[in-house]
């Protein structure tokens, strides 16, 4: 059962960031297993079980990241990650082109939200078309997003705007990809079992956006 992360969790993540080499990792591997990997897996499973039990119609699976970087893609970086995460997502190789619910822990804090990280241009074209033809649908979601204070909107924008819709759609229209995220510094919640409930509640808040973008993606499958 998830009991919270600990100061040792963050100490390890800081350590691996500044000592990203095999000898340091091997000397601190038990700390990683006990204070990072184990609680992250526990959190992932409990969030997944609670959320998927409420939404059995969603074809979700849970995946927890490994600390080892792909040796083919180091690009001058060390072999270990200092940011670790889990995700609730669809199965298949094309998962990054669909919305993903996620949680991430890093040395200075943690974050959670929903993103489409490798959105297909055709998906975002359907998104713009949907806003053009049915502005009330996304408009309702955009207004609800403006009224809340848990998440903020991020995502790469086109250098040349695709259009200039009126608020509140203007913040969404010209995105290449999307991330709705809550980012937090280290706080008591991170070290508490209550983190499970917070992440589940956050995913519930994001569910209308998850369903909306899942529908957009499925139209092209």
List the model feature ranges, each with a label:
Residues 72-132:
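Aromatic- and glycine-enriched beta-alpha-beta binding-site module
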Residues 36-39, 43, 123, 137, ...:
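Short amphipathic alpha-helical segments
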């Amino acid at each position: 059962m998830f009991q919270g992360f600990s100061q040792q969790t963050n100490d390890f993540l800081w350590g691996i960031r500044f000592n990203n080499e095999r000898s340091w990792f091997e000397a601190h591997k038990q700390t990683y297993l006990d204070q990072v990997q184990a609680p992250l897996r526990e959190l992932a499973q409990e969030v997944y079980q609670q959320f998927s039990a409420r939404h059995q119609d969603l074809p979700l699976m849970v995946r927890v990241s490994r600390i080892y970087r792909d040796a083919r893609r180091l690009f001058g970086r060390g072999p270990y990650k200092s940011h670790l995460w889990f995700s609730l997502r669809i199965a298949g190789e094309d998962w990054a082109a669909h919305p993903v619910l996620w949680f991430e822990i890093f040395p200075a804090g943690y974050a959670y939200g929903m993103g489409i990280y490798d959105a297909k241009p055709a998906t975002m074209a359907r998104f713009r078309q949907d806003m053009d033809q049915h502005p009330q649908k996304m408009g309702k979601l955009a207004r609800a997003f403006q009224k809340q204070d848990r998440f903020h909107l991020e995502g790469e924008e086109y250098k040349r705007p695709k259009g200039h819709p009126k608020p509140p759609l203007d913040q969404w229209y010209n995105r290449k990809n999307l991330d709705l995220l809550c980012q937090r510094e280290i706080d008591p919640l991170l070290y508490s079992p209550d983190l499970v409930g917070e992440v589940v509640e956050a995913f519930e808040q994001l569910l209308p956006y998850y369903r909306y973008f899942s529908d957009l993606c499925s139209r092209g499958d």
